[in-house]
Amino acid sequence: MKIYNTMTRKKEEFVPVKPNEVQMYVCGPTVYNFFHIGNARTFIVFDTVRKYFEYRGYKVNFIQNFTDIDDKMIAKANNEGVSVKELGDRYIKEYYEDADGLNLERATCNPRATEYIGKIIDFVKGLQDEGYAYEIDGDVYFNTNAFKEYGKLSGQNLEDRMAGATIAVDDRKKSPADFALWKSEKPGEPSWESPWGKGRPGWHIECSCMARDLLGDTIDIHAGAIDLIFPHHENEIAQSEARTGKPFSKYWMHAAYLNINNEKMSKSLNNFLTARDILKEYDAEVIRLFLLSAHYRTPLNFTEESIEAAKTSLERLYNTINNLGSLLNNTAESNDDSEYLKALDSYREKFIEKMDDDFNTADGISVIFDLAKDINININGKSSKAAVEKAISLMRELGKPLGILQKVEKHNLEDEIQNLIEQRQNARKNKDWALADKIRDDLKERGIVLEDTPEGIRWKFIDK
């Protein structure tokens, strides 16, 4: 299995710290609002990575944090007249509702930053004792000049960043690139006692502390959205490696942006879609199929047409499964399909080959469609029950790491199609050619064609 490592900018063979285990940390949401469809892409991508590791037999320790103390949270809580804790509790609850709606597997642990204040203080104190941090008027900063490898993840030269707009300007700091580990108390903000006076932690130190506490000094995979490479992940590396003297993470993974109608998503452009918005319109499996239809390192464009195309594609796959289900009671028990059963197994091998190559979900999905096409051509009423059952099982097996094809259809597809055929026959008798043509075209759009036979009208699936 190969993973593209942002740190080395190349694909590397995956070798975990502990055999057959994966220690994985994904940066989670700041809980002051509903998460948007761009966040959903990141969460679904790394949920799929986790599911695929499990499919391949690994035990995955999957940590995703909640940032529940932050400038944005404080501002919103003050604006609403509630405590930061009340705001965090509310949106953590909303997060779980939307995450469950997207079929995200629950994390092994979802630590909250405010649960780690004591350990964060100890972490910062350790950095200060080793000469990597300094205190000014109750604020504690990380000394980037003391960490000689600063910039190795993002490729940013420290000197080039001195006057950068992404760095907070503070004349008290030794270097403009130095960042806050601990912030002194300000009016209207939550604060905790510390050796430097009352205050609260900086953003970057929270993840370093929680990851180390729950996963150890060196973890296998640290992941997040591409916009976290700098400064967040760069600063995490500096803090963690300065504190432990060990590599923080063996592999760094980052998911690319999601645009809306070829524009960056933003509230000012009125194109800001929350996961909850999209879940009102589309099933979770449709959303997952769309968001996984491109490789996770490739930017993806969301349009109404593209999500509708994903919906149609998913229906085609379910049509194949449902057609197989309708054949189960009409199979030839004595037929020898042993060669075809072996041929079906080749699709599992192809799927693994694609997914082992840096979790290439786009190519993995293509394998599933190739499998469906093969099934539609080769499995029919003359096939053995073993072949039909194997085909159903394999479709669902390959869909599982992607979080698709896991639903059991509640309706009987055969009865539904037969009902539509009868409606079409009645329309033709009544010379309602428009309705008859519409029913025929609707069925064709679903991959179903009608055939006139001496025994009456029959239907079958085709690959569109």
Swiss-Prot record:
Residues reported to bind Zn(2+): 27, 207, 232, 236
Matching Pfam families: CysS_C, DALR_2, tRNA-synt_1e
Binding site for ATP: 267
Cellular compartments annotated: Cytoplasm
Catalytic activity: tRNA(Cys) + L-cysteine + ATP = L-cysteinyl-tRNA(Cys) + AMP + diphosphate
Span of the annotated motif 'HIGH' region: 29-39
Predominant subcellular localization, coarse grouping: cytoplasm
Entry keyword set: Aminoacyl-tRNA synthetase, ATP-binding, Cytoplasm, Ligase, Metal-binding, Nucleotide-binding, Protein biosynthesis, Zinc
Keyword field contains Ion transport: no
Free-text remark on how the cofactor is bound: Binds 1 zinc ion per subunit.
The protein's Enzyme Commission number: 6.1.1.16
Needed co-factor(s): Zn(2+)
Record carries keyword Transmembrane: no
SUPFAM superfamilies: Anticodon-binding domain of a subclass of class I aminoacyl-tRNA synthetases, Nucleotidylyl transferase
Motif 'KMSKS' region: positions: 264-268
PANTHER family: CYSTEINE--TRNA LIGASE, CYTOPLASMIC (PTHR10890:SF3), CYSTEINYL-TRNA SYNTHETASE (PTHR10890)
The family this protein is said to belong to: Belongs to the class-I aminoacyl-tRNA synthetase family.
Subunit structure: Monomer.
Protein name: Cysteine--tRNA ligase
Record gene name: cysS
